[in-house]
């Protein structure tokens, strides 16, 4: 089976894993997925992540985070997708839940949150929103 949108697949695996109260989820690894996992870890949405498997087929393992038995991530959804890319300038980046959530962007300086992108004055492709 060919995968057309690996980022949507990653977000869906995280969402499904948390709905099923899984401790960790595994998926094929890529540089973009690792960068996205790093941002999620820095923002406190996941416990940790690790890269396992062989060099030719690395696997990304993400440890999910719960608080009082409930998933920390209430909402995680893809914004820009292969059929409709969404790009925002630094002044157009939306605030998620009035600043309680984060938007994750792919910029020329790497993958970062909406707050960091606004502070740096750069825009980019709006990958997903997390709350």
UniProtKB/Swiss-Prot annotation:
GO MF entries: rRNA binding; structural constituent of ribosome
Family according to the record: Belongs to the universal ribosomal protein uS8 family.
Keyword Ribosomal protein among record annotations: yes
Highest taxon listed in the record's lineage: Bacteria
Name of protein: Small ribosomal subunit protein uS8
Source species: Chromobacterium violaceum (strain ATCC 12472 / DSM 30191 / JCM 1249 / CCUG 213 / NBRC 12614 / NCIMB 9131 / NCTC 9757 / MK)
Function comment: One of the primary rRNA binding proteins, it binds directly to 16S rRNA central domain where it helps coordinate assembly of the platform of the 30S subunit.
Keywords: Ribonucleoprotein, Ribosomal protein, RNA-binding, rRNA-binding
A GO CC annotation given for this chain: ribonucleoprotein complex
InterPro entries recorded: Ribosomal_uS8, Ribosomal_uS8_CS, Ribosomal_uS8_sf
RNA-binding found in the keyword field: yes
Gene3D superfamilies, per the entry: 3.30.1370.30, 3.30.1490.10
Subunit structure and binding partners: Part of the 30S ribosomal subunit. Contacts proteins S5 and S12.
Short name of any one Pfam family annotated for the protein: Ribosomal_S8
Gene Ontology annotations of biological process type: translation
């Amino acid at each position: 089976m060919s995968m057309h949108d690996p980022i949507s697949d990653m977000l869906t695996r995280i969402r499904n894993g948390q709905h099923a109260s899984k401790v960790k989820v595994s998926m094929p690894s890529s540089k973009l997925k690792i960068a996205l996992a790093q941002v999620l870890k820095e923002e406190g949405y996941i416990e940790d992540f690790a890269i396992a498997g062989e060099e030719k087929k690395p696997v990304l393992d993400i440890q999910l985070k719960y608080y009082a038995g409930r998933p920390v991530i209430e909402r995680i959804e893809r914004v820009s997708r292969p059929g409709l890319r969404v790009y925002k300038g630094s002044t157009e980046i939306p605030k998620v839940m009035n600043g309680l959530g984060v938007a994750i962007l792919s910029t020329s300086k790497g993958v970062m949150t909406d707050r960091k992108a606004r502070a740096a004055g750069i825009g980019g492709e709006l990958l997903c929103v997390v709350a």
